[in-house]
């Protein structure tokens, strides 16, 4: 059988694999006091040490309390509990109070995180924090030119971030350094650690055995301010890998297959933990790829258990001391025999095919053997316009080496790309190493364009000129997301996510029907030839070339203030939101009843809007402009109930707010899936929103809404969504007795004058989160607590 799924709770021992792995380390007996060793967390933070002793001590307490076997991810999470003695621990129910080891922020989300941290009045961050400049570089002409233009265009933001980093003791990675997740893997991730990052693909570090979780900026501020971080205790989905990858099948195909099985919401509230003998055929960066795209199934995070490939990668990236220490510590966090998984999926790597997922959603999985048929059946555009490789998901040395091996075959046959072909190295280190070893030159000779070490087209930073907006076309990428209009702001672009290998092979045909496993191309002499499977080393044989030094350590110079021009269009100091007035909410308008898929890209678009991520007033002009209005089936066209005119969503919201009228947004399933951007929660709060009421939420967005003092609520009866008219007026009752587990009531006053009716609204607020709501936001609550002290 290709794959096996166990839907019911199941038990499966993973001890055989973990024990054989541990034997391969020939590790020494575990020291009685692990903390006797002082091993630096990174080469940039010599005075910040890995705290394995805390994990060991916490686990001794937790295991006695729970008296059951623990999975690898559970051991890491519970090893970071703030209070292991009194913490309630029940999967899917409890809220864990955790102490992460570090925080990572990308430049688009760091602006708001730092602005919030500044409001908290703290002198410096309490844990190691880094900021990475990767989101604001637009891809257009090529790496150096695009980078130079970005440095000019974004100077105000970069100067703000660098100055703030110096003031608050934060590490700063300049533009051109690379993508945050590749930088973290190369320099900061370590087995057994707990990382939070203000980007949804933070789980990439799970490829190095770290629990790494994407969060909103307000969550990051908690940790930066030395407060425990709260996470609903996740369930654990086990994915057992057997067999071995070979030929055209790559690590990317593992997660593409898993996405097809679990869908975009199947991992919600769970950690996906990989294990089994098949893990041994994966490189460390390949494991990172799989964990990275776990965000597309809604998973809290994904992780692989510590294994020899991780040790090899740590040593290759100049972290031998961490590798030695992790090997010594490995037995403590190895998954226990008969550890319990809430669901188990089995995948045989021997029979796994390359996949292409899409269009318009990353969980529409099609094996390559059936893709030609799917193109015809669904009338997808057959011509391949552009192939793009790179992104935080697939931009490692191994990824690029395999792609280059395909390009070399094409060069040897005298052919060049028929589709536009772009290459994005994941980091300056990867770029420099690929340049030294010749792979980038090979890809250029084949017709490729090398872009800057940044996110680029993956997040919509792409000045595309080969098609007009609205023109139906197909692209293939090695990225992670393919929501409508995400890459190029063209809703008619059909984007398919696959491996760098398949992307590279397909650009030489220019045809979506081309299958490199079975089909041939014509060489320069008109003879048929077929590509051989790609080859590439997991690690460079000559070691990594670090390239240019793009890291800026926290300044020893005292920075007294972080200046923000009050007339700036890109940066704006925050004004605290008003606290709750102590009453139930009456006479609320329905701003928009959103129909169908509504991701954070629909709620708060990226691309050209990224430049306003530090200016709440300006970026609020993109609220819900991509969402489909259930009333008329159109985007960004709403009826203003005060004037009767049709306007943009933000303009209607502003009109209601300025007239003192609060409003709600209605949505359907998995509302807010995708990016961790907290702007999707800040904007409705700024514009006068009171609640977002849906059939279900994506994890990060639900938390972000709570953090900003909004009410994320779900229909107890999903059919109520269909019954409500967008022109009705609603009340939210029960807030005066707001309590965990106690539903609220939505009272609907129909616009047609018919009798009012009511429906129950569920919520997941705990006691502390209710205090956020009452204070007006989590940041307000933090400030209040600080004043009391």
Swiss-Prot record:
Its main location: mitochondrion. Keywords: 4Fe-4S, Iron, Iron-sulfur, Lyase, Metal-binding, Mitochondrion, Transit peptide, Tricarboxylic acid cycle. Residues 1-32 form a transit peptide. It is found in: Mitochondrion. Pfam families: Aconitase, Aconitase_C. It comes from the Eukaryota. InterPro entries: Acnase/IPM_dHydase_lsu_aba_1/3 (IPR015931), Acoase/IPM_deHydtase_lsu_aba (IPR001030), Aconitase/3IPM_dehydase_swvl (IPR015928), Aconitase/IPM_isomerase (IPR050926), Aconitase_4Fe-4S_BS (IPR018136), Aconitase_4Fe-4S_dom (IPR036008), Aconitase_dom2 (IPR015932), Aconitase_mito-like (IPR006248). Its EC number is 4.2.1.3. CDD domains: AcnA_Mitochon_Swivel, AcnA_Mitochondrial. [4Fe-4S] cluster binds at residues 392, 455, 458. Belongs to the aconitase/IPM isomerase family. PANTHER family: ACONITATE HYDRATASE B (PTHR43160), ACONITATE HYDRATASE, MITOCHONDRIAL (PTHR43160:SF3). Monomer. Catalyzes the isomerization of citrate to isocitrate via cis-aconitate, a step in the citric acid cycle. This is Aconitate hydratase, mitochondrial. It comes from Schizosaccharomyces pombe (strain 972 / ATCC 24843) (Fission yeast). The lineage of its organism: Eukaryota, Fungi, Dikarya, Ascomycota, Taphrinomycotina.
């Amino acid at each position: 059988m290709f794959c096996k799924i166990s839907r019911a709770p199941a038990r499966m021992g993973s001890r055989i694999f973990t024990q054989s792995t541990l034997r391969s380390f020939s590790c020494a007996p575990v020291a009685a006091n692990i903390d006797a060793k002082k091993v630096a967390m990174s080469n940039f933070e010599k005075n910040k040490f890995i705290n394995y002793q805390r994990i060991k001590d916490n686990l001794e307490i937790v295991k006695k309390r729970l008296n059951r076997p623990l999975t690898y991810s559970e051991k890491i999470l519970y090893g970071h509990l703030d209070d292991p003695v009194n913490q309630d621990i029940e999967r899917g129910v409890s809220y864990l109070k955790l102490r992460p080891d570090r925080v990572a922020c990308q430049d688009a989300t760091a602006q708001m995180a730092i602005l919030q941290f500044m409001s908290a009045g703290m002198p410096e961050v309490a844990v190691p924090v880094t900021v990475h400049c990767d989101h604001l570089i637009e891809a257009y002409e090529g790496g150096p030119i695009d980078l130079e233009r970005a440095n000019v265009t974004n100077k105000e933001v970069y100067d703000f971030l660098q100055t703030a980093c110096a003031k608050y003791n934060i590490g700063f990675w300049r533009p051109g350094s690379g993508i945050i997740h590749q930088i973290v893997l190369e320099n900061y991730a370590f087995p057994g650690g707990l990382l939070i990052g203000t980007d949804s693909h933070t789980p990439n570090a799970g490829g190095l055995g770290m629990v790494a979780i994407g969060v909103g900026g307000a969550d990051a501020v908690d940790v930066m301010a030395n407060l425990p971080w709260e996470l609903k205790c996740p369930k654990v989905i086990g994915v057992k890998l057997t067999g071995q990858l070979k030929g055209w099948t790559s690590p990317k195909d593992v997660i593409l297959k898993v996405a097809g099985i679990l869908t975009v919401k199947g991992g919600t509230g769970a950690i996906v933990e990989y294990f089994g003998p098949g893990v041994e055929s994966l490189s460390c960066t390949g494991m990172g790829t799989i964990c990275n795209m776990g965000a597309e199934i809604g998973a809290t995070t994904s992780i692989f258990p510590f294994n020899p490939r991780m040790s090899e990668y740590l040593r290759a990236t100049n972290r031998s001391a961490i590798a030695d220490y992790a090997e010594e510590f490995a037995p403590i966090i190895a998954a226990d025999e008969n550890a319990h998984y809430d669901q188990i999926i089995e995948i045989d790597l021997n029979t796994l095919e390359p996949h292409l997922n899409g269009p318009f959603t990353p969980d529409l999985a099609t094996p390559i053997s059936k893709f030609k048929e799917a193109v015809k059946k669904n009338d997808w555009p057959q011509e391949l316009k552009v192939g793009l490789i790179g992104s935080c998901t697939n931009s490692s040395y191994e990824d690029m080496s395999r792609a280059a091996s395909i390009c070399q075959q094409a060069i040897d046959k005298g052919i060049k790309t028929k589709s536009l072909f772009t290459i994005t190295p994941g980091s300056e280190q990867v770029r420099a190493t690929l340049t030294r070893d010749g792979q980038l030159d090979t890809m250029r000779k084949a017709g490729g364009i090398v872009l800057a070490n940044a996110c680029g087209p993956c997040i919509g930073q792409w000045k595309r000129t080969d098609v007009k907006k609205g023109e139906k076309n197909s692209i293939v990428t090695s990225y992670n997301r393919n929501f409508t209009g995400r890459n190029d702001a063209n809703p008619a672009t059909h984007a398919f996510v696959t491996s760098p290998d398949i992307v590279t092979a397909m650009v030489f045909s220019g045809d979506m029907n081309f299958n490199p496993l079975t089909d041939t191309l014509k060489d320069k002499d008109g003879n048929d030839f077929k590509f051989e499977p790609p080859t590439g080393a997991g690690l460079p044989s000559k070691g990594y070339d670090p390239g240019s030094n793009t890291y800026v350590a926290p300044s020893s110079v005292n920075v007294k203030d972080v200046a923000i021009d009050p007339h700036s269009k890109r940066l704006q100091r925050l004004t605290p939101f008003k606290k709750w007035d102590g009453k139930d909410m009456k006479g609320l308008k329905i701003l928009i009843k959103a129909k169908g898929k509504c991701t954070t890209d629909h709620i708060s678009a990226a691309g050209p809007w990224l430049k306003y991520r530090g200016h709440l007033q300006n970026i609020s002009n993109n609220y819900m402009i991509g969402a489909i209005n259930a009333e008329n089936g159109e985007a960004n066209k709403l009826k203003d109930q005060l004037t009767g005119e049709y306007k943009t969503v933000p303009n209607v919201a502003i009109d209601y707010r300025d007239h003192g009228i609060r409003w709600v947004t209605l949505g359907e399933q998995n509302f807010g899936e995708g990016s961790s951007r907290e702007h999707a929660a800040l904007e409705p709060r700024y514009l006068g929103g009171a609640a977002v009421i849906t059939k279900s939420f994506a994890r990060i967005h639900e938390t972000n809404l709570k953090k900003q003092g909004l009410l994320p609520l779900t229909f107890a009866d999903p059919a109520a969504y269909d019954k409500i008219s967008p022109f009705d007026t609603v009340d939210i009752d029960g807030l005066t007795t707001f309590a965990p587990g106690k539903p609220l009531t939505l009272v609907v006053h129909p616009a047609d004058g018919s009798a009012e009716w009511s429906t129950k609204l569920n919520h997941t607020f705990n006691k502390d989160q209710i205090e956020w709501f009452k204070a007006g936001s989590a940041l307000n609550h933090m400030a209040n607590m600080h004043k009391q002290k």
